[in-house]
Structures are given as structure tokens and as C-alpha cells.
């Protein structure tokens, strides 16, 4: 389909150590009908110098803005509003795409045009700081299991959303600091939005991103998420109590155990 255009969005702030890899991964795409949108939060390092150096290589397919924002999801929403493509993907400044990621997505849509109106999601390879990796698979069963428990059931770095779904469901809820992507996917699940699962690696994610940092914000976002989505007060109390206990215990659990738990948890 000649009118199938992708909008790839990268948000960044002081990302000079990682953003070049991200930019190169977009530039290397074998499918070339895309626009690349970079939303920078007025970085104080040389992030924008790197962006400007690569801009000519995109031959008019890159656009960027560099200005203060109100947080991660304000920046993402800004990028979505700038997007003109049919399908929108968010590739953060410490993530990078596989070279054939967009071609795989285009093939899936060309083979079944109904996929144009569905969320498309694939597999992610998570890269730990010690050099080890973990494959995060994607299945409907896993998606449903987590969505029913108000949790993120898709690999966000490998998830691509039709612009029409953002128009229908809405963009990211900026009250969240860490979990607006999970909230968005839960809203899609509750609204019956279709999801097409691709059992191929589309993206890579490095350890150390904002969602991987343990903090009070994590608990606050969990409580907001449960308050927003739980159907009854008793259900909210159940999940909120568990969230508070888990957040407290994590400060007394060694990092290796947290990592092991995360790996086992995502095999379900």
C-alpha cells in the first residue's frame, strides 16, 4: 500500500550518550516511507548537535522541536500531535529498532489490511548493563493476563499504534509520571481495540530507562492507575494494598532478585 506511512517519535533530554544509536536505527530502516519526529526537552548537553548532524541524511523526513516540556508523556503527546503518518511508533532515546522493523510491519498490513486499524506489537530484546540479554515475547494470552490485572501487557518499544486509535481512545494521560503507557494500553483493552501480535523482534531496549528506576513515583502511578481502572472499591483496595507492600519490600530486596523476579514474571 503506497499510502502506508509511519511516524517514528523519539523523545529525549540530555541523551547524548544514547541517541545516536537510536537515530542510526531509524535511518537504517529498509522501509523508507516514514517521518522521524524528535521531541527534545531543551537538552543542556550536545543532544541537539547530534540530531542536527544527522538531519540532512533523512532527506526531509526528519522534524524536531527542542523546548521545555512538562514530562515524558507531555513530550510523547507533543510528538503524536505532530505526526502525519498512518501508524505511530515511539522509540525512546535509549531504544533502537531492528533494521527491518518497519518492513515487517508493512508486510503484516499488506497481507491483512484489517491490521491497519489494530495495534501492532512485536518482541523486544532487553539489554542489561552487564551485557546479558532477555527476550520479551508477545502473545495474546500474556496481554490479556496483564491487562485484566491493570498492568502493561505489551512491549511498548515494539508497539505501533494507528493514528486513528489515538484519535478514538485519546493520547497519554499526563497525570502519570511513569505508567501512562500502561494506562493507554489498558484503555485500549477495555475499549476492545484489536491487537495484532508479531512473533519477531522489532526493537531493543536498554536497562536504565525512566520506567526502570525504583522510586516513590512508581507507587503513586500504581495507585492512580488502580483508582482509574478498578471497577469496585474492594478491587481497588486489593490492588492498592498489594502495590504498597511490594513497593516497600523492594527497598529491602537485592537487585539480582528483582531482576530474577522480573524475568520469571514476564514468562507468564
Please place each PLM-identified region on the residue numbering.
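N-proximal low-complexity "stem/linker" segments adjacent to membrane-targeting elements
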Residues: 1-28
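Glycine-rich, basic loop-to-helix element that forms the pyrophosphate-binding segment
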Residues: 65-83
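Conserved donor NDP-sugar-binding/catalytic core segment of glycosyltransferases
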Residues: 100-134
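A conserved acidic beta->alpha catalytic loop
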Residues: 32, 40-49, 92
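Short beta-strand/loop segment that forms part of the nucleotide-sugar
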Residues: 33-42, 63-67
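Acidic donor-binding/catalytic loop of UDP-sugar-dependent glycosyltransferases
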Residues: 46, 74, 95-108
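Conserved nucleotide-sugar donor-binding catalytic segment
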Residues: 139-218, 222
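Short aromatic/hydrophobic "clamp" motif used to bind/position activated sugar donors
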Residues: 88
Amino acid at each position: 500500500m503506497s499510502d502506508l506511512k509511519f511516524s517514528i517519535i523519539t523523545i529525549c533530554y540530555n541523551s547524548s550518550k544514547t541517541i545516536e544509536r537510536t537515530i542510526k536505527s531509524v535511518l537504517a530502516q529498509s522501509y523508507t516511507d516514514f517521518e522521524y519526529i524528535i521531541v527534545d526537552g531543551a537538552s543542556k548537553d550536545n543532544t541537539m548537535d547530534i540530531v542536527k548532524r544527522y538531519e540532512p541524511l533523512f532527506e526531509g523526513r526528519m522534524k524536531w522541536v527542542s523546548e521545555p516540556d512538562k514530562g515524558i508523556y507531555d513530550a510523547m503527546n507533543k510528538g503524536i500531535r505532530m505526526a502525519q503518518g498512518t501508524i505511530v511508533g515511539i522509540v525512546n532515546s535509549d531504544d533502537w529498532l531492528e533494521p527491518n522493523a518497519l518492513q515487517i510491519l508493512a508486510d503484516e498490513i499488506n497481507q491483512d489490511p484489517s491490521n491497519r486499524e489494530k495495534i501492532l506489537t512485536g518482541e523486544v530484546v532487553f539489554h542489561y548493563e552487564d551485557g546479558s540479554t532477555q527476550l520479551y515475547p508477545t502473545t495474546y494470552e500474556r496481554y490479556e493476563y496483564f491487562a485484566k490485572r491493570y498492568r502493561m501487557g505489551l512491549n511498548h518499544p515494539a508497539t505501533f499504534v494507528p493514528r486513528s486509535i489515538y484519535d478514538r481512545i485519546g493520547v497519554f494521560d499526563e497525570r502519570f509520571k511513569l505508567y501512562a503507557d500502561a494506562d493507554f494500553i489498558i484503555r485500549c483493552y477495555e475499549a476492545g481495540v484489536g491487537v495484532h501480535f508479531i512473533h519477531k523482534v522489532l526493537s531493543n531496549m536498554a536497562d536504565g530507562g525512566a520506567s526502570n528506576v525504583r522510586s516513590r513515583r512508581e507507587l503513586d502511578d500504581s495507585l492512580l492507575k488502580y483508582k482509574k481502572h478498578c471497577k469496585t472499591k474492594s478491587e481497588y483496595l486489593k490492588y492498592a494494598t498489594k502495590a504498597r507492600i511490594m513497593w516497600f519490600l523492594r527497598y529491602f530486596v537485592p537487585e539480582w532478585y528483582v531482576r530474577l523476579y522480573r524475568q520469571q514474571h514476564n514468562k507468564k
